[in-house]
Amino acid sequence: MRKQMIALAALCPLTVFAVSPVHNRVIDYVPAPGQFVNVLPEWEDGDDAEAMAAKALQYMTGEGYYISLGAWGGYVTVGFERTIVNVPGKRDIYIEGNAFQSSQSSTKGGNSEPGVVMVAYDINHNGIPDGNEWFEIAGSEYSKSIHNYEVSYIRPASDKEDIMWMDNQGNSGFVNRIPFHTQPYWPQWLSGRSKLTFQGCRLPDNSVNEGTADDPYIVLKAFDYGYADNYPNFSDKDGLVRNEGAMIDIDWAVDANGNAVKLPGVDFVRIYTGVNQTNGILGENSTEVVRVVNTHSVGTGDAESVDESIVIDEKVLAEFLARYGGVESLDNSGLRLYVDQSGLVSFSLYEEALAQVFDLKGRCLYSELMPEGRGFVDLSSYSNGIYLVSVAGQTVKVMKR
């Protein structure tokens, strides 16, 4: 038993009581062509898709950086250490961008480049977003948008040429090169591909010229709600109060037919540029993204952490799995263990199961057969150290301190 527990301890990730609410993975980064592509983040000779995803994570979670998704359809997919719980009546996801309000216009917006938000719950717990798990956040422009939209970008013979696009509505145009940005606009780690095709939802144009034809002043209007890079990150001048306009309510999710979906939570978020539009000398609309954050947190700044007392509603989970997960009967195979800051490990069982606590020497410190329903293992009275908590075959390594 001791050898088995030592081996198990080596395999289990360490769970400490402070878990960051910020995304900790970039699963894929696939921008469409654009004026900031290969710059934000910087592509260097030899960088492949994996290297660029790693750079995207570094840019997004570093200080003062963001990534560009390029023209319509370009996207980034991120994951989290903890599921973002869908809390009724609350906005659950905060997405930082680089939108700002124009000081010279009364129009709501200025530099708003809205990105469509997709969300997914990890139904099969495989750690990656499978195709059938994605749901769109239906923002304020959902009914005014073109759905099942598709754009293909054609790689030109030279990196100095504009890049042609064609959509499935019979339209075509160009991602135009502009004097301020002279690098290649085609993602260089995808240089072996002659065409890039994206599918999704095309939002309405949001560009307004508040100047004249000879002296244009372009304002990119903000939509009411439900998009990334649509509102400034903060609602106060000191940058202390997060702007609710930059937040997403998971309850805005819809399926492919536009029907509302009640998700228990979100493990993955995908954001893609939602407006296919060129803005004169400003170039194409290109959504920019910084951090994606779980709003259900405690503390501030570097001390901010996920509020582990907020857990998934098991009834909502059961109904979601029954409808979308192909689950006919529920058991403990998808059990999740939650650890809060007091040292309480909580879970919900669909059938009775054994709960145990071990130290790193393999000694069993606690063992109890737990009934169906909500259950808890309390580590608050234990000495500081590392423990293995095992429930129904699921094990989490917890640092008590």
Task: Name each region found by the language model.
Residues 1-19, 376-377:
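Bacterial Sec-dependent N-terminal signal peptides
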Residues 19-115, 133-323:
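A domain-level signal for the mature, folded cores of soluble proteins
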Residues 118-122, 358-360:
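Predominantly extracellular/luminal cell-surface or secreted proteins
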Residues 126:
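Acidic carboxylate motifs that coordinate Ca2+ or other divalent cations, activating on Asp/Glu
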Residues 131-141, 369, 397-401:
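Short amphipathic beta-strand/extended segments with alternating polar/hydrophobic composition
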Residues 326-401:
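C-terminal outer-membrane/trafficking sorting elements
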